[in-house]
Amino acid sequence: ISTENMIYTAQKLQDEYDLLTQLSTGVQMGSAMAGNTKQQMNALGTDIEILKDRAEADRLRDFIISTKASNHRHDEVWNYNPVRFFKIRIPKERERYETRGKQKGNIKECFHGSSSSNCLSILKTGLVIPPVNAPHVCGRMFGTGAYYGLSSTKSGRYSLGSWGGKRSKYDNIFLFIADVALGKYYTTYDSLPSGTPRGYDSIWAKAGQSLYNDELITPYLENQTLKYIVELRP
């Protein structure tokens, strides 16, 4: 992440969120905001549009609702449901996945949650893997890597700030949907702070013993690509 993308102040945090909101609104308004939207898209360098395929939107809605984890039934995140779907393509990230990651196989459709203030930078560059000593990093039960969930509410709790992240003052949250090529994955039922073992492409941390929900972790960014960003509201 370059210096100009880093968030230093509360005002900068709010500015990042406001720009994401403007982007979302601009796409929805279509021709009425065509010029402004085009400028915003060019600035991002990312292809983003409202998902017009009704069948695919219905599939994604069912995917999100059907994967709510029962252990989150009494959490705030349980009440959040999808209201808008955006199709995204981050050119360099997608090319990296198509040429170097996809062929590893064992592809799973997964969720990634992040606070609204982080969504714009993710849309610009894709996910990044923070260094081990990075401050304010949630999780890391399975070492350094990109973390994904198979439960919408598990990932949604990160979007909501339930794990200690910054909560938005608005009542909406955003959830990414990605394809992750697990390749040769290492199965564990407990934490693995040392990370992905040598010779493996990823970790599949499975629920049932010490874990409530499955998590998928890969230390290789070419193994994943973000396909959609979904807005959810209670």
Predicted regions and their residues:
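Intrinsically disordered, low-complexity terminal and linker regions
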Residues: I1-N118, P219-P234
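Segments that shape or occlude catalytic/ligand-binding pockets
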Residues: Q11, G35, R96-P234
